[in-house]
């Protein structure tokens, strides 16, 4: 899926753990300076975790200057509220 964030086109992909740079990660995000920036989210996550990780990686893309702690705290709040409001992510099928 292609997304425009801060005037740059990003790809967002939901992938198997084996496709992640580290199999321990739930999500990953390139730096905005990358030629073709990519965000990946593990596709096997439960709905609440998938929403949280997607918001988390999008925050990294939008605000790369934020610390990991700030991104985590902000994603937890935003994703928690969105989840309570009924938001869920349905990854595109390939």
Task: Tell where the protein language model's regions lie, with residue ranges.
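Metalloprotease/metallohydrolase-associated module, dominated by Zn2+-dependent proteases
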Residues: 1-48, 64-94
């Amino acid at each position: 899926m292609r997304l425009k964030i801060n005037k740059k086109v990003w790809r967002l992909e939901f992938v198997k753990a084996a496709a992640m740079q580290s199999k321990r990660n739930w999500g990953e995000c390139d730096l905005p300076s990358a030629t073709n920036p990519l965000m990946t989210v593990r596709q096997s996550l439960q709905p609440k975790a998938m929403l949280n990780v997607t918001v988390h990686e999008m925050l990294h893309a939008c605000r790369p200057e934020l610390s990991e702690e700030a991104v985590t705290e902000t994603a937890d709040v935003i994703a928690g509220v969105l989840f309570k409001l009924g938001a869920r992510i349905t990854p595109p099928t390939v």
